[in-house]
Swiss-Prot record:
It is found in: Cytoplasm. ATP binds at G124, S125, D126, G127, K128, T129, T130. GO terms for cellular component: cytoplasm. Cell wall formation. Catalyzes the addition of glutamate to the nucleotide precursor UDP-N-acetylmuramoyl-L-alanine (UMA). Keywords: ATP-binding, Cell cycle, Cell division, Cell shape, Cell wall biogenesis/degradation, Cytoplasm, Ligase, Nucleotide-binding, Peptidoglycan synthesis. It comes from Clostridium botulinum (strain Kyoto / Type A2). It catalyses: UDP-N-acetyl-alpha-D-muramoyl-L-alanine + D-glutamate + ATP = UDP-N-acetyl-alpha-D-muramoyl-L-alanyl-D-glutamate + ADP + phosphate + H(+). The keyword Ligase applies. Pathway: Cell wall biogenesis; peptidoglycan biosynthesis. GO terms for molecular function: ATP binding; UDP-N-acetylmuramoylalanine-D-glutamate ligase activity. Disulfide bonds: none annotated. This is UDP-N-acetylmuramoylalanine--D-glutamate ligase. Its EC number is 6.3.2.9. GO terms for biological process: cell division; cell wall organization; peptidoglycan biosynthetic process; regulation of cell shape.
Amino acid sequence: MKSNFSKFKDFIKYKKVAVVGIGVSNRPLIKFLVKLGAKVTAFDKKHREKLGSISLELEEIGVDLVLGENYLDKLDGYDVIFKTPSMRIDRPEFVKAKEAGAYITSEMEEFIKYCPAKVFGITGSDGKTTTTTLVYEMLKKEDYRTWVGGNIGTPLFANIEEMKEDHMVVLELSSFQLMTMDVSPEISLITNLSPNHLDVHKDFEEYVWAKKNIFKYQSSNNLLVLNKDDDLTNEMENEALGDVLKFSLVEKVYNGACLSNNKLTIQGKEVCDSKDIKLKGRHNIANLLAAFCMINKYVSIDSMKYVATNFSGVEHRCEFIREVNGVKYYNDSIASSPSRTLAGLNSFEKPVILIAGGYDKKIPFEPLAEGGYDKIKILILMGDTKNKIKSAFEKVISYKKCEMEIVIVNSMEEAVKVADNMAEKGDIITLSPACASFDMYPNFEIRGNEFKNIVNRL
């Protein structure tokens, strides 16, 4: 049962509230809390000079600022603390604040708790953004007033009073956001699970545990959608509290969605033929099947078919950039894990020139080498993980007795230059890093845009 937002308004008014992080996504939250009558202090590691004009903008509406290296040392005396998702709740500063009586929460927890609209929550290791966008587009096609947020779109909490019971909200949720959740969306999906974010999570078990929060607090009339082809997610049916639908690329599924004789079906009804889909790769067929399961009760077959056969993809996801001298360039900068890069490689019909490497999330690259060695013509590596990836591939190349040229570079500019020089007519060059961007770029979008800019200058 959803709580009425008036309860939150009564609760937060006059409270001493700390918001940790003054990034773009937290700024609407800070302003909204001020509007609701809270006494807000915003915390950030950056100094005033690096934050720019936002510091003055917040001070003008009465927000106090705590900035600099030791900013978390001053969390004493607050009634409520909104933490940024990637910060662990067991940090000493949060533990101390909680012991002193602070209520520690996040924007997403409070949003799901009080949102009057129907909430669709999507998580998993790969395919989250594409599936979130597909669900959003299908609901929109059916003429629902639809909002999209979480990891994509815009922060939604500040808009909660505009939302109605007959609206639809689609959220992409990360393991960081789910880690402290004690509330679940009414309709939840786990796309698949493979090791990821082990630089933040203690181990893979904790990562899986966090993902399960997307359905752990559901009620009996809620829906959980699971991937039948993924052993980990398939077994979660036993823990479900409500209804379950499954999707599969390889098995016939009667209570869910599947690919049968190249037809995409939901509950036995044909939606479209796989040859009519614009999205590349079998992994995107899986994303469509998952979306069908989520919206089956709310969207007609016609709307599903329209989106499935017209949607051409999301930026930075196997995105075609251009063809130069017979060589095709693709931007798959979103691929921040080995499994996502492998899915991208599988969408091409021939071995590619792969540009990979980046920030080390402490996840193994052996599965990428094992599954991808025969899908790569030339491997160009950069970033913190370049030697780690090189080592994983060299082991596989050695015992498979195959050949693959591996080139180490120091920048994106150099990577594209080397790829361009080594490519022959008919080749495919793809940026699919298998790693996060933080060693060289603030996010995967900026990384992808730099790659596109360099390619467009060729």
